[in-house]
Structure formats: structure tokens, C-alpha cells
Amino acid sequence: MKQSKVFIPTRRDVPAEAEALSHQLLLKAGLIKQSTSGIYSYLPLASRVLNNISKIIREEMESIDAVEILMPALQQAELWEESGRWGAYGPELMRLKDRNGREFALGPTHEEVVTSIVRDELKSYKQLPLTLFQIQSKFRDEKRPRFGLLRGREFIMKDAYSFHADEASLDETYQDMYNAYDRIFKRVGINARPVVADSGAIGGNHTHEFMALSEIGEDTIVYSEHSDYAANIEKAEVVYHPNEKHTEVAELEKVETPNVKTAQELADFLNRPVDEIVKSMIFKIDGEFIMFLIRGHHELNDVKVKAFFETDNVEMATQEEIVNLLGANPGSLGPVHDKDIRIFADNYVRDLNNLVVGANEDGSHYINANLDRDFKVDEFGDFRFILEGETLSDGSGEAKFAEGIEVGQVFKLGTKYSEAMNATFLDNQGKAKPLIMGCYGIGVSRTLSAIVEQNNDENGIIWPKSVTPFDLHLITINPKKDEQLELGDQLYKELQQQYDVLYDDRKDRAGVKFNDADLIGLPIRIVVGKNASEGIVEVKVRQTGESEEVHINDLNTHIATLYSNL
């Protein structure tokens, strides 16, 4: 394709709001154009890359007998009400009404729709298992869209859904999909690591995320340098190692702590280590107010709280609710009180004598508060985030942290949706049973961004050959010179027989062409310049920067060798 005929609006400036490197490069290289916050148009180069990513996904889905369909983006509210997610999903669900007042959602996911399709058609265990997938746009009303394609309000996803008669069948498909995802990310050129994860709003009891390692990643991965252990920090278990209490129990004493709001401020004010401070927090869980205690240098993990109580109905109590309950504001709360509130504490609170806790009076704290003497804990558990350097649950050593971009996730849904929506089949005994489900997603547009995030240098993008918008970038330095134009046209005609070629026939300066070529980042560049009359061109590999002068008689062989080694 001739570059003079392709819409590639490259730019030299970077918008101030473009924080992520991938966002900057996709804008500068002319791949995307922002319509409004979190919404982008995919320009010709991006469209070609997305097609290549989708082609790889389709090949891998077909290899495990997944069948492609296309479902509506516009979903009626009644389906979401059946599953219980219409009220539970939250403000991220984009809702609208038609002219008759009927409510709809722009789908962020398609569990309800696909379940409604199969419940009318799958009647017997003989029709199972079945896996359906689609590639289409999704919608999510993000509070703060950021990082370009990494967190947008409209995005492209591949989502798949599997239906089974038993858990063994689900396990098999789950593993097939897990392996297919691993192959997909390797093929598109992403260093992605599968990690144990939380299922979030989709639900289910078993899930893995595929995380593309990146400094800009919004998720923290906990991993081992000595084993295959990897987990999202929300799911990483904290191993409890009891420590003996060596200090003598002292008398409970109330002290004034004016204008102290945080655990660190309190530690500084009292000249105590922050890990001897105990933070008290009030949550509302299924309508019940519950106090949680954790040490001052730890952070409460609400995902673990939800898992412990087996409910998603978990929220922080409001300031008004806390004041009505305990008579003090957050920052002055503590377990020493006579209120009928259950108290749960992180395991590592057990190790402390003479705790510093809030006195349930603004500007006051207790020192030397002790478990059992001054307050009771209903139950201990793992309620916090792991710290880097702590022992991993698989015994392989210390926890290491890395940042990652979630590019895919696989879920075992079980019967959550089939039971709610009455999707049943007849087993081999003629008994009606709910379909057992799995769901599996890949962020296609997010994968595009993650590829750029991991494959670049100071000059621009470096496309992996599997997804590159074009294989070769053919450039004539000065098309006004007949020998260059003629050789360029000749090579363009010949190379198109084997490769996708972007032919820069523009009448711009050589520097502009070279800068654009580096920015766009096609794997191999062929430059027709001053030696055109001798049949010699320069061939440059974008990834390594290595270049070599090659006679056109040897060009096909040379390019084939280079391409096979990319």
C-alpha cells in the first residue's frame, strides 16, 4: 500500500493527558484518535494490528473447538434483573432507555445474553460441552478513563462462554482455554504471566488473570523467583508465623492525641513504632456493622473480607454511621468499648501486647490496650495485603512484586447464571440440572496497547512480526529522481507478491520519512537512495537497528533470512 494513499497522521507532540508510553506512541504514530474521554477511533494502522491480533485469537479458539458468534451490544434490563446484576453491577454499567421507556444496558460483558440463548436450545447432556465466543465492542462507564486504550469507556474484547454437564468437563475446557491464552499472548509478542485472581463482579469461584508486565500496570503481581507461584496482590495469602510476646502487660492508659489522623502521625506523636499501632475500621457487611483491626503498617484487603464472609455486600461505613455508632470519627476508633459490635482482627494483631488503639473519643487514644483483658476478638484471619519480602504461601521464599496490565482472564462460573436464569439440561438419567459454565475474556484493544507498552524504544514502536500492520517499509528517499522512483516502484511490485508492504512514496524530506518509519515501527525497512542506479538498497532491522547494503538480486533471500530470525 502506498503511504501517500494511507491515512497515518503522525505527530511530534504528546498531549499532556497521555501518561502511558503506549498511549503516547499510539497517538504519535497515528494509530488512534481520541473522540472524547475514554473513547477512541482506530485508524488504518491500528485496524490492521487489531485484525492480526483477532486472527491469532480466532485460530487458537478454533483449535479448542470454540465456535464464533456475535451477540448484541444492547442488552435488555430484564436479563440483568434475572441474574441479579442490574442493581449490583454499579455505576460502571452504561444504562439507557428507548423511546418507550424500556431500560437497556450497553454490555460490558455477555453472561446474561449468552445464557438466555442457550437455555432455549441446550436440552440434553448429549449437546454438551459447548463453547461460544465473540469479538466485539464493550462498554464501561469508567469514573476516570486513563492510559489511552488501557482503561477506556469503549473497548474491544474477545469473550467466550462454555457450558458443561459436570465439573470435570469444565475443568478440561478451563485448562484448554488457559493454555490457548498462554499461546495467544506468546504469539502476539507479550510477556504475560498467569496469576491467581479475584473474580470480581462477574462471579465464580476459580479464576486466573493474564498480566502483561509493565511499569504502568495498575495491578500488582506477587510472584516467586524460585517457583511458578504468581497471584494478584488481592489474592496473595499472608502466612501467619506466631511471635512470642516478650513485653510485660502494662496498665491501660488514655492519652490525648490532638490533630492526629493517621497511624504514622500517631506513631510519631507517641514515639512508638508504627507496627505497634492498631488501626480500627468499621465495615457494613450484609447490613451488619463489624470492626476490623490491623496493625499500623498493614492495609486491609476488602477482597479477602468478601471471601471470608462469602458475600459481595461489603462497604465501608460512612462517617455519619461511625459517629452514630461509636461517638467518634475515623482515626479515633478502637476496640475498647461496650457496644454490641463484632470484632475481627488480622492474624498479626495476636502478636502484640500493650497496643495503641483509638479511645472512641476524637483526639484521644489508649496505650497499653491488651487482648482479652481490655477487649475481645471474635475471630482472627488473613484480612490484609501481603508485603514485599514476606513468606509466600507455597514455601518457595520471599514475595516479590511487579506491576502488570490485565490482558486476559479465565473464570469458572459454576451455576451462578444458569441457576438464576433457569438454564437447565437433562442428564443421562433424565434429570434436570443447571448448566455448569465458564467464561473467558481477552481485552483485544488493551492487548494492542500492551504490545506497544512492551515493544518500543526511544524512537517509537517496534512491532512483533506476528501483529505488525505491514511486514516491510519501503522508502524512496527522493522520488523526484527517476532512478530511485523506478527502482522503488519495481521493488514495491515484486515484494508485494510475498509481503504486506507500506511504500513511502511521499515527497517529504528524508528526515521526516525516517522519523515516521521509526515511530511506526515496521519490522524491516528498505531504503532506496543514492545507490539506486547500481541496484543497491539499504536494509535495516527495526528491532536491532542493524543495517546492511544489499543488491536487489539478493534482496528476497536476505529479507527471508532476516524475517525468519525476528
From Swiss-Prot:
Gene3D superfamilies: Anticodon-binding domain, Bira Bifunctional Protein, Domain 2. It is an enzyme of class 6 (ligase). It catalyses: tRNA(Pro) + L-proline + ATP = L-prolyl-tRNA(Pro) + AMP + diphosphate. GO terms for biological process: prolyl-tRNA aminoacylation. SUPFAM superfamilies: Class II aaRS ABD-related, Class II aaRS and biotin synthetases, YbaK/ProRS associated domain. It is found in: Cytoplasm. One of its GO terms (molecular function) is proline-tRNA ligase activity. It holds the Pfam family tRNA_edit. Catalyzes the attachment of proline to tRNA(Pro) in a two-step reaction: proline is first activated by ATP to form Pro-AMP and then transferred to the acceptor end of tRNA(Pro). As ProRS can inadvertently accommodate and process non-cognate amino acids such as alanine and cysteine, to avoid such errors it has two additional distinct editing activities against alanine. One activity is designated as 'pretransfer' editing and involves the tRNA(Pro)-independent hydrolysis of activated Ala-AMP. NCBIfam families: PRK09194.1 (NF006625), proS_fam_II (TIGR00409). Belongs to the class-II aminoacyl-tRNA synthetase family. ProS type 1 subfamily. This is Proline--tRNA ligase. It comes from Staphylococcus haemolyticus (strain JCSC1435).
